[in-house]
Amino acid sequence: MTRGLTIALDGMGGDHGPETVIGGADIASVRHPDIRFLIYGDETKIRPFLEKHPRVLSVSEIIHTDVSVSMEDKPSQALRRGRKTSSMWLAIDAVKAGEAQAAVSAGNTGALMAMAKVILRMMPNVERPALAALWPTARGESVMLDLGATVGADGYQLVQFAAMGEAFARVVFNIEQPTVGLLNIGEEEVKGTEGVKLAAQMLREADLPIRFHGFVEGDDIAKGTVDVVVTDGYTGNIALKTAEGMVRLVVDYLRAAMRSSLLSRLGYLLAYGAFRALAKKLDPRASNGAVFLGLNGLVVKSHGGTDAIGFAAAIDVAVDVASADLLSKIVTDLDRLSGLTTSMAGRKQNSDIAESEAVLS
């Protein structure tokens, strides 16, 4: 239910700025007719696009600022230059102030994460944030995290990611007990880093309401073996970019094959419906929109190079998680981890020592 929801938009974020943001808001407003938008950015650049979309214009308010964060800015630069004045900062701050239930930005990922952490702060029992998104699979979709927020996560943090990802999956898939798997180089218990093995041990032994499947490998992501795939941001981001590259390669191969001869062109026309269905399945815009989990507020990251269709999908994600009160569900799940803090911290220290010794040996 979207009644009463207000979404804050970074009107200047991404490669295409207001054109994509306003176009996406227009598409989203059809799917969510009761939604309202607070759009932050340069009014002289935003209003011309807004006036082309009267439906969005009627449910939007522009909050002017001529300061924006570029895609090239380092997080430290963005914080220094855009603190309290940039369109990205103001959109996130609207969530903190309770003026909006979620913020959506297609801007610089590092800057967005840095600002979100400064403004919203981390939840209790969470050390690092995780970026979670929907991933198309042979069985439908799964949740994968972390996709780049925390480059190196230890065992304790991976367990936190598992709890947050499980709550996210319950909300977006509307299922009671999603299955959770840890991404690893093999299914055997002896394989993997000390952190991954420690996380698996914790998830097996802890009295948590999580259906832990065990380890999953890279090919299990596309198979949809589990509902939630948990990994660190370094591995997750590489997996994401690899998958995006493979999709582009497959599409290029198909286009080349369909144009290779007259017979191929005729075959394409005969199978046009099937190709359209395949293209829809492979379209990354449908899965656009990743949520920063672990913060005291909802921030959704849209792909910087997406178009209006993709940005609308990111708004859809914001609406879904805000409507389902995702934050309270995550807090409840994380409270169940608080009793494990002492024992996990001890094992975490042992894990850190073991990894250090492995590096030095």
Swiss-Prot record:
Pathway: Lipid metabolism; phospholipid metabolism. The keyword Calcium does not apply. Its EC number is 2.3.1.274. InterPro entries: FA_synthesis, Phospholipid_synth_PlsX-like. SUPFAM superfamilies: Isocitrate/Isopropylmalate dehydrogenase-like (SSF53659). It is an enzyme of class 2 (transferase). GO terms for cellular component: cytoplasm. GO terms for biological process: fatty acid biosynthetic process; phospholipid biosynthetic process. It comes from the Bacteria. It catalyses: a fatty acyl-[ACP] + phosphate = an acyl phosphate + holo-[ACP]. Keywords: Cytoplasm, Lipid biosynthesis, Lipid metabolism, Phospholipid biosynthesis, Phospholipid metabolism, Transferase. It is found in: Cytoplasm. GO terms for molecular function: phosphate:acyl-[acyl carrier protein] acyltransferase activity. Homodimer. Probably interacts with PlsY. Belongs to the PlsX family. Catalyzes the reversible formation of acyl-phosphate (acyl-PO(4)) from acyl-[acyl-carrier-protein] (acyl-ACP). This enzyme utilizes acyl-ACP as fatty acyl donor, but not acyl-CoA. This is Phosphate acyltransferase. It comes from Parvibaculum lavamentivorans (strain DS-1 / DSM 13023 / NCIMB 13966). The gene is plsX.
